[in-house]
Amino acid sequence: MAQHPTSGYVSTTRPGWIVYWVTFGLMAFSAVCFMAITLTKPQRHRKHGYCTALIVTIASVAYYAMASEGGATYTYAIHGGNMRQIYWARYVDWVFTTPLLLLDLLLLAACPIGTAMWIIAADVFMIILGLFGGVNTHKFKWGYYAMGCFCELIISIGLVFNAMRSAMARGGGISKVYAGMAAYLTILWWGYPIVWGLAEGANVISSDAEVAAYAGLDIAAKVFFGWMIMAAGPIITAQQDREYKEGKGYPSILDASIDSPLSITQTQPIANPAAQATRGLPTMEPGANGTAGSVPVETGNLQTVV
């Protein structure tokens, strides 16, 4: 293992490397487990499993990079006057995995795509601002910190209020599952700016302490959260099947009923009325002025004209 200079430098030592390797192992093991569980389910019930497995897969790659002493640089710390090791690989991880974590929750709530977009956009801005602040060598780093905290406040409001309304509208066990998971993730995520303020910000804790703190938060936010999603699988599946039978479809972040054949009304011309009649279906009545007519078709509980 390569030796980093320690005089005048705040860098990771042996305890930190051990934490990185252990965290990598947990992430990789969880990725295999999540994917194995997901593949046992019907295709229509796999979206949460795929999302959760992808989260820990990306995190495992990032932790492997950091455990192998990569993905880092040294930046002058304005507080303390020394050089501090900053892991940019951590931010690359977060810019992919935190939107996926939010997507996991927002899929559960089946919230409108507009709501999902501004919540996820605030998250991406928060991560980028954290990176900019971490590598900044002036007092302006605290400006990035303040803006990042504001973005996290926006995320919290979106999860606790806006997305919660969508989850409550679904009813059943989903609203309770969402409420618990949203509260868990919202509270947990506020631990990140606290660690950032002590590490990249004020430079008052060691690099090893920073590694341990971030690893603990990541394990809680990705591994534990992932197992919570897996454990809630029967409730989620039962709710989806019930909604499908009611003609509401499998709720999606894009459209609450895009997967339901009962809730989609299509308009299509009937080119050959004679062929319709031979199949035992009603034929088109000619429209006004000799134009093509229409046929009544039952779509779920509604009757429309195609």
Where would I find each of the regions flagged by the language model?
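Polytopic alpha-helical membrane-helix bundles and their juxtamembrane interface segments
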Residues: 1-92, 97-306
